[in-house]
């Protein structure tokens, strides 16, 4: 990963405290913004963006039947709670060249909630820190 592909918009975040702000029901509501481009269902189809089933813990750019940007494929880090939080603040600044056009989620509670929701949508949700 080079500085040409990724500009860090990372602030030091206590991910445990951040996720404690989250609410699963609120996350489902916030995810409706995401659902314009992403499905989040077992066996679901890719849409404009990849299916986000099992996204937490998955390697970025790894859904085999989705055509990612070169930047996302090169990024290839695991979508941890921390990585997802940093990405969702401002996706295009975090991974330069990503195809994701969404501006980001400024509110911590919105990010925490949608991360909790996405984590719940998988075969083996990751334990919370």
Where are these regions (language model features)?
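N-terminal post-signal-peptidase region of extra-cytosolic proteins
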Residues: 18-20, 36-39, 67-70
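C-terminal capping alpha-helices of c-type cytochrome domains
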Residues: 78-129
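Gly/Gly-Pro-rich "capping" loops immediately C-terminal to redox-active cysteine motifs
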Residues: 24-28, 42-81, 99-104
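The canonical Cys-X-X-Cys-His
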Residues: 27, 31-40, 114-118
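Electrostatic cytochrome c docking/interface patches
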Residues: 2-31
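Short phosphate-engaging motifs
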Residues: 36, 44, 110
